[in-house]
């Protein structure tokens, strides 16, 4: 089998991988095989975390809305149900932002939702 001299292409490929592992610990930053393995795992974790991020934020928004709703004498589920029945289209992200930054207007929204929830 003839010898294959890859020249600069192999070096370029290795350097591309090793540049991505800059800041990693011990051999993971300067040994090619370890760097490839670590990068592959990092990409997997990144992919998984991008999916989990959406769930985590939704849970955070619901927790914030529930806390603010309880301060206004109702619960999260009653508030969301009342908003839906009243025809108020505010998503959870916006509701949580209102609850944090403008509690008075969140209270007004909760008051609008409470009669609709009672029906």
UniProtKB/Swiss-Prot annotation:
Role description: Binds directly to 23S ribosomal RNA and is necessary for the in vitro assembly process of the 50S ribosomal subunit. It is not involved in the protein synthesizing functions of that subunit.
Family named by the database record: Belongs to the bacterial ribosomal protein bL20 family.
Name under which the protein is recorded: Large ribosomal subunit protein bL20
Short name of any one Pfam family annotated for the protein: Ribosomal_L20
GO molecular function: rRNA binding; structural constituent of ribosome
Entry GO terms, CC: ribonucleoprotein complex; ribosome
Superkingdom of origin organism: Bacteria
Keywords tagged on the record: Ribonucleoprotein, Ribosomal protein, RNA-binding, rRNA-binding
Keyword Ribonucleoprotein tagged: yes
Gene Ontology BP annotations: ribosomal large subunit assembly; translation
HAMAP family: Ribosomal_bL20
Entries under PANTHER family matching the protein: 39S RIBOSOMAL PROTEIN L20
């Amino acid at each position: 089998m003839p010898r294959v001299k890859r020249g600069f292409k192999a070096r370029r490929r290795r350097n591309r991988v090793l540049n991505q592992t800059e800041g990693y610990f011990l051999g993971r930053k300067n040994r090619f095989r370890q760097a490839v393995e670590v990068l592959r795992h990092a990409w997997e974790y990144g992919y998984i975390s991008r999916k989990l991020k959406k769930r985590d934020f939704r849970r955070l928004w619901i927790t914030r809305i529930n806390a603010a709703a309880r301060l206004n004498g109702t619960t999260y589920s009653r508030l969301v149900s009342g908003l839906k029945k009243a025809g108020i289209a505010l998503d959870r992200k916006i509701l949580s932002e209102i609850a944090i930054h403008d509690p008075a207007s969140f209270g007004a929204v909760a008051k609008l939702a409470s009669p609709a929830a009672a029906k």
